[in-house]
Every structure is written in structure tokens, then in C-alpha cells.
UniProtKB/Swiss-Prot annotation:
Keywords: Cytoplasm, Retinol-binding, Transport, Vitamin A. Higher expression in adult small intestine and to a much lesser extent in fetal kidney. Forms a beta-barrel structure that accommodates hydrophobic ligands in its interior. Intracellular transport of retinol. One of its GO terms (cellular component) is nucleus. This is Retinol-binding protein 2. Its main location: cytoplasm. It comes from Homo sapiens. Belongs to the calycin superfamily. Fatty-acid binding protein (FABP) family.
Amino acid sequence: MTRDQNGTWEMESNENFEGYMKALDIDFATRKIAVRLTQTKVIDQDGDNFKTKTTSTFRNYDVDFTVGVEFDEYTKSLDNRHVKALVTWEGDVLVCVQKGEKENRGWKQWIEGDKLYLELTCGDQVCRQVFKKK
């Protein structure tokens, strides 16, 4: 594994995204649209500083963060909540804890070969996404 996550990544698979969105109380119509979308993720990484853009034909989401520095995140394009987020390294895995209304919320992201793996968690639901480097 590597800590270098720079690049453009295209979604290959998206397992249990609907379950994850239900745990976030996202409405039925939005879930039905979102679950059918393919996302592209662009990561601009400079050491521990990240600028991430996630795009689809429905909604886009940008988040900038520095590893080890807590920040206020507004999850506008997902569930419209404000959370306190902290991203840290666990080995070569980025781990984000998002504190707010929902318990056990966050994500893990890592690289293996030419694939980026992302696990999104809320409550007891885990969504597993795989992206391939473009």
C-alpha cells in the first residue's frame, strides 16, 4: 500500500450505498437516484494536505483537509449536516471520524495497486466503494 492518493479515480463498484444512505436518513427519491450514479473522485494531495472533489451527474462534493487537524465539515451534497471531522493516518489508511448527530460515522480510504478503496460507515451500515485510477 501507499500513502500517495493523487489522481483521478473512477468508480468500479458501490456496495451497500443505499443502506448507508438510509442510516443517514436520506429520503427515498434521493436514494433511488444516487444509488444508480457512477462517481469520479479527483484527489490533489500535497503531503498531509488533501483537496478532494467527488463528482457525478447528480451532485458534486468538495472537501479539503489536513491530516491531524480537526475541521468543520458541511455534508451539503449528502445529508446536509454539520460534523466535526478528524482525519488521521493508520499505517497507509486514511481514517476519518465524523462527530455529529449520527453515531459511528466516518470513512476509511486506502490504495492497493491501481485501486482506491473507500469504506463509508454510519451506525451499523458500511458502504464499500472501489475506484480505479484513470
